[in-house]
């Protein structure tokens, strides 16, 4: 409750001014579950302009949605006016938002009962939709009619399965049936929003359970490039996903599991940044090389430690090995390399030009590469004079 106490002065101040105010959302849910608390959000009957008038230190980030960031005790908190939402457009956003003075009206528009619990500053729960019961049963249940909730915002179906992965809960029967019925509506949702949820699914503690739900509800068939992947997705549930430390590894392993032959094309379809695509593809390519042979100095040097560590964890998952020392071994091998990158070489193109008395040309870059590999393999010491002598001995000058 420590973090809530830091923010409780906001609620107390709002109440002193005649308004209602409560802690709401994921932070309350995680407090009940005893999980680490993320952002703490506050809902209030005060209108945005009233919130801004009460708290001089504020940032008006989303006034059209009723949200003001209030800075209290050096921490930012989202304070949002109670609201209801009208008819939804395109199965993803309300056509308009109405501010209301009723907590119940605000909570009933939320997605799942576990996320529709409010809490007073004293820690008393206001649970109008049996959210605590759902948490106790470890069930994901929609607020009200599941069909209505998913037709309002189809992304809620992905969120539901993402919560399976992060919390280990199960989809309540009617909620699961509604996902099977309305899964096609996910095709109206921007792929960027789906990608965010899917990445949280892949990196969750209970990823395997969530992937099974993705198959059982047939929701996977409405995702880009996954329409024909039922058997491969089931294959992915047979592996241990616990060893990954980054989302890059999780995506690389997922692409391996589904047998994706054109990973860059797949990832572009899912709207990844070029940098992320490059890293994921690099991990996959390195894993392929790793399957053919163990690490050697040249492979490790060319790969770099960042990609090598991730590739080793993916490789270990692929071969279903639980040798937690393998990444440590890669780190030790890398630290023993004579140089870690080309910038550490004690020779330059100018040195070669001076020694050879030849005109500049492609031969300089080729020679630098030969020297680089020789240093990495331990064939020559990384000292200027030693390199010159080695070149002469090899008749390369």
From Swiss-Prot:
Residues holding ATP: 26, 29, 110, 153, 156, 159, 162
| Top-level class of the enzyme under EC nomenclature | transferase
Give the encoding gene's name. Answer: cca
Quaternary structure (record): Homodimer.
Q: What organism is recorded for this protein?
A: Bacillus cereus (strain ATCC 10987 / NRS 248)
Quote the InterPro entries the UniProt record gives.
Bact_CCA-adding_enz_type3_sf, CCA-adding_enz_C, CCA-adding_enz_firmicutes, NT_sf, PolA_pol_head_dom, PolyA_RNA-bd
Give a GO biological-process term: RNA repair
Recorded GO MF terms: ATP binding; CCA tRNA nucleotidyltransferase activity; magnesium ion binding; tRNA binding
Where on this chain does CTP bind? Answer: 26, 29, 110, 153, 156, 159, 162
Q: What else is known?
A: A single active site specifically recognizes both ATP and CTP and is responsible for their addition.
Cofactor(s) this protein requires:
Mg(2+)
What reaction does this catalyse? a tRNA precursor + 2 CTP + ATP = a tRNA with a 3' CCA end + 3 diphosphate; a tRNA with a 3' CCA end + 2 CTP + ATP = a tRNA with a 3' CCACCA end + 3 diphosphate
This chain's protein is named: CCA-adding enzyme
Q: Which family does it belong to?
A: Belongs to the tRNA nucleotidyltransferase/poly(A) polymerase family. Bacterial CCA-adding enzyme type 3 subfamily.
Q: What is its EC number?
A: 2.7.7.72
């Amino acid at each position: 409750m420590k973090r809530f106490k830091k923010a409780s002065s906001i609620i107390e101040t709002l109440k002193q001014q005649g308004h209602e105010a409560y802690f709401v959302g994921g932070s309350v849910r995680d407090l009940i579950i005893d999980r680490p608390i993320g952002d703490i959000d506050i809902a209030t009957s005060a209108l945005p302009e009233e919130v801004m008038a009460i708290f001089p230190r504020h940032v008006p980030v989303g006034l059209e949605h009723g949200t003001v960031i209030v800075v209290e005790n050096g921490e930012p908190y989202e304070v949002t006016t109670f609201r209801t939402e009208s008819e939804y457009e395109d199965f993803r956003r309300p056509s308009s938002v109405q501010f209301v003075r009723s907590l119940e009206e605000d909570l009933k528009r939320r997605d799942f009962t576990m996320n529709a619990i409010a809490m007073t500053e004293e820690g008393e729960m206001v649970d109008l939709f049996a959210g605590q019961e759902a948490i106790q049963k470890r069930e994901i249940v929609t607020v009200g009619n599941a069909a209505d909730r998913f037709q309002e915002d189809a992304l809620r179906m992905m969120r539901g399965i993402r919560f399976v992965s992060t919390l280990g809960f199960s989809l309540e029967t009617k909620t699961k049936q509604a996902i099977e019925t309305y899964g096609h509506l996910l095709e109206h949702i921007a792929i960027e929003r789906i990608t965010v949820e899917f990445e949280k699914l892949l990196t969750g503690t209970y990823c395997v359970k969530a992937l099974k739900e993705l198959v059982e509800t047939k929701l996977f068939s409405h995702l880009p490039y996954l329409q024909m992947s039922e058997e491969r997705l089931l294959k992915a549930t047979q592996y241990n996903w616990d060893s990954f430390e980054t989302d890059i590894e999780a995506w690389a392993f997922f692409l391996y599991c589904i047998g994706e032959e054109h990973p860059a094309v797949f990832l572009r379809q899912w709207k990844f940044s070029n940098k992320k695509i490059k890293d994921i593809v690099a991990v996959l390519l390195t894993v392929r090389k790793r399957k053919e042979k163990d690490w050697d100095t040249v492979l490790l040097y060319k790969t770099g430690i960042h990609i090598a560590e991730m590739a080793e964890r993916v490789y270990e998952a692929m071969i279903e090995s639980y040798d937690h020392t393998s990444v440590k071994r890669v780190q030790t091998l890398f630290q023993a390399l004579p140089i870690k990158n080309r910038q550490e070489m004690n020779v330059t193109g100018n040195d070669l030009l001076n020694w050879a008395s030849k005109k500049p040309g492609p031969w300089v870059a080729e020679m630098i590469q030969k020297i680089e590999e020789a240093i990495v393999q331990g064939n020559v010491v990384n000292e200027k004079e030693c390199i010159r002598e080695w070149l002469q001995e090899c008749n390369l000058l």
